[in-house]
Amino acid sequence: MNLHTLLLNKFRTALVAIGAPENSPAPLSRATKVGFGDYQFNGAMALAKVLKQKPRDIAEKIVEAVELDGIAEKLEVAGPGFINIYLSKEWLAAQLSHAAADPRLNIESQPTKTVVVDYSSPNLAKEMHVGHLRTTIIGDAVVKALEFMGHKVIRQNHMGDWGTQFGMLLAHLNDKLESNQVAETALSDLEDFYREAKVRFDEEEGFADRAREYVVKLQGGDSHCLALWQNFIDVSITHSEEVYHKLNVSLTRDDIMGESAYNHDLANVVSELQAKGLAVESQGAQVVFLPELADKEGNPAAYIVQKSGGGYLYATTDLAAIRHRNKQLHADRTLILTDARQALHFKQTELVARKAGFIEPEQTYEHCPFGMMLGNDGRPFKTRTGGTVKLVELLDEAVERAETLLSKRETDLSSDELKVLANKIGIGAVKYADLSKNRTTDYMFSWDSMLSFEGNTAPYLQYAYTRVMSIFRKAGVDHQTLNAPISLDAPQEKILAVKQLQYVEAINQVIAEGTPHVLCTYLYELASLFMSFYEACPMLKDGIEQDVRDSRMTLAALTAKTLQSGLSLLGIDTMERM
């Protein structure tokens, strides 16, 4: 049950009933202040000019027309024409009882769509670094939310497994193998290997010439070069899988659709663009000109799909990927998660793809850009020496720091239990620190803030969950079977109840906008409201009537269930003890 949608539909029907034009604005929002109801409808002001009536008079008519019997206990016109909606405690209690009895918290699935999500997509032959964190975890959170709501999700890990850089890498690996090194040993540290090859390419003319020859051979399908190339791919994918496992994301080998997968189709893409009069020759290259994106002087943007020497570009591969996803995978919607610096490229790519008919009018194509992770100096996050931070090393440090923090707290956990706990807290802290920020903005990386047990952090939410679970242990009850009749007599009980029912609104916003921070904010607000409820509405004290105790226990169980569900969508583990 979606509370926002239910109320919105009721008010839209009421607007039609009072003579408002169809599709009139129907702004419905959550109340921002205690004492002004649970929701607020602000549609009267926008209709004043259209209906030639005072906003308050229109609001009064809406109140008379809207059918909320049994749902709202009171509607109140306030100010110039706001309508404050006070939901019925009995109705809220009934909805919570349905949620308590349902593993899905009484959340209905959406009509199924096929959604392709392109995320993570690291360049192979290098180790994953912190620059891959945001695309990987934001993409995975969106994927899990989509699947939770019933959509068919096709993950596409568009790995960079092709390109001219492989020439120097293959030449360097070939030299290593000829000196009797085993491939796995030579490639044990991909960063060092890449650095060695780059130095040789820049400083040894003979090596650079051989590297260029290897590029030509690789693109020509030479069996020896392909075998060397496959060594890089296998080692790199294994490394990526280890990172995905540490991060608790759902990507597997089956989701890989690297750049090389489209090699066979690149010539066809260019030919089709030429046949449709889109790609034309310019200085020997094949270019699609885009007057829609002209510069200040009126020069159209140039989108190159084939170099003058015959080589193809990332743009060509991206077009082939779009065509494959829409024509073969039949995507209703495609999401691509990359950093904001690629926004113009994907804007141009969509424009070309739509002109070419690679995207049908009813298919949506959305680039979801994100900002950068910054260090304390406000610059892109680097090591102290200015190098790239390996993602696996960052995650290992997070776990070590979490273990150090936990060792300073009083606990009866064993050493092994402490290590398991540190892993959940450390990894969760890194992920949540990122996911809780609006993806379109840059954010500053801080160990102290992300590992804090106070504020909007993963440790705080994980602790809130363990605190709820400790109530059930002390009471000797199984939280999974709790479904007592709920009463909402205390203000804190009702506020918590309304927040429980807003969970699906947060999930839907994540799906619609690709913004997991909305879910993070919701979970933090839920946990904070539970703490207020816990202080004001005791469950374990003597003298509390059994029906009141059971009602509050059921509310607590619902909170635990919602926290665990929401954190699992973010790929963050919960624990029953801390």
From Swiss-Prot:
SUPFAM superfamilies: Anticodon-binding domain of a subclass of class I aminoacyl-tRNA synthetases, Arginyl-tRNA synthetase (ArgRS), N-terminal 'additional' domain, Nucleotidylyl transferase
Subcellular location: Cytoplasm
Pfam families given in the database record: Arg_tRNA_synt_N (PF03485), DALR_1 (PF05746), tRNA-synt_1d (PF00750)
Motif 'HIGH' region: positions: 122-132
GO biological process: arginyl-tRNA aminoacylation
GO cellular component, as recorded: cytoplasm
InterPro entries, alphabetized: aa-tRNA-synth_I_CS, Arg-tRNA-ligase, Arg-tRNA-synth_N, Arg-tRNA-synth_N_sf, ArgRS_core, DALR_anticod-bd, Rossmann-like_a/b/a_fold, tRNAsynth_Ia_anticodon-bd
Signal peptide: none
E.C. number(s) listed in UniProt: 6.1.1.19
Reaction it catalyzes: tRNA(Arg) + L-arginine + ATP = L-arginyl-tRNA(Arg) + AMP + diphosphate
A molecular-function term among this protein's GO annotations: arginine-tRNA ligase activity
Keywords (A to Z) from UniProt: Aminoacyl-tRNA synthetase, ATP-binding, Cytoplasm, Ligase, Nucleotide-binding, Protein biosynthesis
Enzyme class: ligase
Assembly notes: Monomer.
Family: Belongs to the class-I aminoacyl-tRNA synthetase family.
Protein name: Arginine--tRNA ligase
Lineage of source species: Bacteria, Pseudomonadati, Pseudomonadota, Gammaproteobacteria, Alteromonadales
Gene name as annotated: argS
